Regions:
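Short, solvent-exposed loop/turn segments at conserved positions within beta-propeller repeat blades
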Residues: 41-42, 93-100, 145-148, 198-206, ...
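A short beta-strand motif characteristic of beta-propeller blades
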Residues: 59-64, 117-121, 165-169, 221-227, ...
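Beta-rich, blade/repeat-based domains predominating
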Residues: 67-78, 124-136, 170-185, 228-245, ...
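N-terminal secretory signal peptides and thylakoid transit peptides that target proteins
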Residues: 1-18
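Short loop/turn segments immediately following the C-termini of beta-strands
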Residues: 43, 87-89, 145, 193-194, ...
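Asp-box/WD-like beta-propeller blade repeats and closely related beta-sheet repeat scaffolds
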Residues: 116-180
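Short loop/turn segments immediately following beta-strands, especially the blade-tip
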Residues: 50-55, 107-113, 154-160, 212-217, ...
């Protein structure tokens, strides 16, 4: 009899296995067809777009409605399924009952990229914030922020989400924001951001929670938390595709940290610190470092800078100022150190997620909400939407076009690309 592991590994192996060059989802190596599908949400609606990498153009195709507001998604290694987490109690999307939170499988048409519901959604206990799969796509890992937690679900032989893998005692930290399995599939890292302090509440410490990982089980937890996690608010990480280097965006300090990997695990020492902002001494409003991606060729690193704080102007709330940009770093191929070489505005506000196509020639940034900005003495609205960029041989970005999207009181929260 064929075992579950053998069956799933065989199906995954029948397609091009993904490289590990993305923090949000593994776009993988370019497919034989060269086709790429992009998926982006507005609230509970997840829309499929065709992607023309050569022209950096997107064409809207079809929309599937999930049980709640989309929070995150991650593709199966075969590129034929997409696993989506959703919630009815999330920023920009609050619906009754607020206790509805789900993990849903979608089937991807390998010829067109069209998506459809696959099986019955699995109910989750609280709002999920991040989802990923292990390297052979045998398990789905879900991170929850409040209360912080991580759960692991088996992938059934029909590719629907299966039973939960029961864990031992885990310290999930404070405000878990991402869960990733390391490239060797032997460890898992839970990124816990903590919370910034306020005049009435002290800072909650952040940490990287590193586990041994085997067949869905998380064990032997070790916490990486410089200075006890104070002044350390990690948000997202990504791995270099071929070297033992890990990059972590530090949201609350607007930094990019580099960690060396040893025996598949990150060493606790910070190898390199880099700024994310073009003007780190000119903070006009709250800045937050965001998503981080290593280019598929391993030579460049990309990170998001986000700002959306508003102030009253003529009776309207308008953008207070700040950097909404992608920072590009050149990676020293001997040491792993990233050096900033470009900061480019994304043409909209709050680029929560961005993604690089599998060929490494195109980057797309997603922006959550419409925001008013001053235009001289007037006020105009900058809509939510998508911006596309061409990636040069030198790693630098060139803005190509933007797509305004009416979120109708909801929010865009996630987007990603999958090769077909």
């Amino acid at each position: 009899m064929v075992s579950r592991r053998t069956f799933l590994s065989g199906v995954a192996g029948s397609a091009v296995m993904p490289t590990l060059s993305f923090a949000q989802s593994p776009a993988g190596a370019p497919s034989a067809s060269g086709k790429v599908a992009l998926y982006a949400n507005v609230g509970a609606d997840l829309t499929h777009y065709d992607v023309d990498v050569a022209t950096a153009e997107l064409t809207k195709r079809q929309t599937v409605t999930l049980p709640g507001g989309v929070q995150y998604a991650w593709p199966h290694a075969s590129h034929r399924y997409l696993y989506v987490i959703s919630s009815n109690n999330a920023p920009g999307y609050v619906r009754e009952p607020k206790t509805d939170h789900h993990l849903t499988a979608l089937a991807i048409d390998p010829a067109t990229g069209a998506i459809k519901m696959h099986g019955t959604p699995v109910r989750l206990p609280t709002r999920p914030l991040h989802v990923s799969l292990d390297i052979p796509s045998e398990h789905i890992l879900v991170a929850f922020n409040n209360p912080a937690a991580v759960r692991v679900y088996r992938v059934n032989t029909d590719f629907t989400p299966g039973e939960e893998v029961q864990q031992g005692t885990i310290d999930p930290g404070i405000f878990a924001h991402q869960i990733r399995v390391t490239p060797d599939n032997r460890h898992a890292i839970l990124v816990t951001r903590g919370n910034e302090g306020t005049p009435t509440k002290p800072e909650d410490p952040g940490a990287l929670k590193v586990f041994d990982y085997r067949d869905g089980l998380l064990t032997n937890e070790v916490s990486i938390a410089p200075d006890g996690g104070k002044g350390f608010g990690p948000r997202h990480l990504d791995f270099h595709p071929t070297k033992p280097w890990m990059y972590v965006s530090i949201e609350t300090q607007n930094k990019m940290y580099t960690y060396m990997m040893e025996n598949g695990r990150p060493k606790p020492e910070i190898a390199f610190r880099a700024e994310t902002l073009a003007e780190p001494t000119n903070i006009r409003a709250r800045q937050a470092a965001g998503t981080v991606h290593v280019h598929p060729n391993g030579r460049f690193l990309y990170g998001a800078n986000r700002a959306e704080e508003t102030v009253d102007y003529q009776g309207k709330q308008v953008f207070k100022g700040g950097e909404n940009s992608i920072v590009v770093y050149a990676i020293n191929q001997s040491t792993g150190e990233p050096t900033p070489i470009q900061h480019i505005e994304t043409q909209k506000l709050h680029p929560r997620t961005f993604h690089i196509d599998p060929s490494g020639r195109m980057l797309v940034a997603e922006h959550n909400l419409p925001v008013n900005v001053r235009d001289g003495d007037a006020v105009k609205e900058v809509p939510a939407g998508l911006s596309t960029f061409r990636i040069g041989d030198d790693g630098k970005l060139t803005f190509v076009r933007k797509y305004d999207i009416d979120v109708a009181g909801s929010t865009m929260f996630w987007m990603g690309m999958v090769p077909l």
